[in-house]
Amino acid sequence: MSKASFSENANISNQLINRELSWLQFNDRVLEESKDKTNPLFERVKFLSIAGTNLDEFFMVRVAGLFNQIKDGFDELSADGLTAEDQLNRVVLKTKDLLKKQNEAFLELKKELSKEKIFIRKMSELNKKDLMYLREYFQETIYPIITPTAIDPSHPFPFIPNKGQAILLRMTRIKKKRELNAIIVIPRALPKFISLNNSETINEFVTIDDVICKFANEIFPDHNIEASLQFKIIRDSEIEIDDEAADLVRYFEKAIKKRRRGNVVKLEVLTNSNKKLLNFISKKFKMDEDHIYEVEGLVGIQDIDEICKKKDPKLRFKKFNPREVERLKEFDNKFFSAIRSKDFVVHHPFETFDVVIQFLEAAAKDPKVIGIKQTLYRTTPDSPIVKALSRAAENGKVVTAVVEIKARFDEEANIELSRKLEKAGVQIVYGFAKYKTHAKASLVLRKEGAKTRSYVHLGTGNYHPINAKIYTDLSLFSSNQDLAKDVEKFFNYVTGYAKPKKLNKIFMSPLNSRNFFEEKIENEIVNASKGKPAEIWAKMNSLVDPGIIKKFYEASNAGVKINLSVRGVCCLRPGIKGQSENIKVKSLIGRFLEHSRIYCFANGSSMPSRENQVYISSADLMPRNLDRRIEIIIPIENNTVHEQILDQIMLANFKDKSE
């Protein structure tokens, strides 16, 4: 990690935004989409769900990390000069503000949903017929699967999994008048929302939590139910990686099991919960009052999209159909002829991701193809890409898959798919123990006459067919042999630790990506000093690295105009006189998740023009991407592709007024 030193004459917090607080600002922007009435109603509900899911994952990783730093006595300050304790305190306050907004959004959406005859009912609002139906549902569907547990010396407190929801009850035995607490963990196999009426005109729902509370006396017939508490927990879910583990797969299998029992870092309860029960449960999880988060009306907001069942087109975004790729149509879907003709780029999801799948399927079937090398960071369990690689191996081709088992929350799935590929005859490589292989690359080796020609697919996003429908990403297809030779070296580096002596086209983390960015920014500074056009356009998910931010500030002070599109975390403070007055930052949040990483440099000419330098990458500008991951930066040299990226993506992005 670069330890950039900032001006000692200025407060460090005025030069950098704290990473954790910036992330919370990002999630606030996601939450704002749930309030935006220009979005269809069900899409607003979905944004509320996404904001809740995002916050859970933030606590599972980032907030858990702060807890661990405090516990371990870690005294190093963050890049913006805060201790772990300072950061945690600020995160707590900001999160509670965010949850107030979430509560407001939920109540507003309930009103909007009711106008569409979609209701989330309280038990007190129901008639006898509804209650009879729910009692039957409870007896037939809920009761057989739940495990009510009395809490006393002979019944230990049950394990509640990460993101688990439960109900704590305080009861009094009718005969002995003895007070007793009991807990019911809500099974994940059951839906959060139970439908009362699913006609074409009216949808009514109640939560499973409320149903269990209503009929709890049927679980404990000899008791009076005095009070109940609905709650949800979030556990520390980070896996500490051992670089020297003898067997990486076995290590991760053990670590995944251990992660399931991580410490509780967030306790979510309904507002106005019973104080006695709240005190009891907070002691059980060793949570002080600051880390108890109150929500109104619904524990587990991420489940709210379950109610979006009504089939009414106006409630959702208009169906989106991606375009077919024109270049392939020109060549009658003959992939290798189309790619050999000249490079082309595909902009997902506006153009279909099927082209990537079809590329690998064509390679699997083509008798001239002798080998395929492929990175896999995230994909689906039934991925057509995995099927194509398996088929290729079964057809006698030499197939190598670099599967990243350190991909957070996909570790288990990736171990499983690697075993599936291995059974089909694919050679599996897990890459470096200390670096995640985050680059997106596919290399196809094809026998053409007396020579072997290489074809490559390089992307900014994962080989994930489902995410590709909602993530904006770029795919480059090329048979440029200089570029292909670099990709061959990339694979040899990952599979055999063969560090390349020279790369002709690409740049790689952790080898030279940091130097690449610093040199490109420095070149713009030099051009500005010579009176030449000096400008940078960049699009990424996150901008965190202090060294790169410092270089951007230096460029701004030299007169370089910098336009940044940063979807998520941004630690740079734009528009500050004498520091960043020439830097503009925007963040696009909308129907599609902005995921592509694009870096453009004026190179002495006004933007946009052919003389500008354009690169696409798998890397964001974060210390981990530059120093602790395997990433690729790819130059765009084909004139048509170069123009498409500058004009149709970057210029359009900066002109887009929605933020």
Identify the function of each model-found stretch:
Residues 546-549, 553:
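Glycine/threonine-rich ATP-lid/beta-loop region of ATP-binding domains
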Residues 561-565:
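Hydrophobic alpha/beta core scaffold segments
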Residues 1-536, 554-558, 570-592, 598-659:
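N-terminal localization/anchoring segments of enzymes in phospholipid and broader phosphate metabolism
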Residues 541:
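Cofactor-pocket helix-loop regions in the catalytic cores of large enzyme subunits
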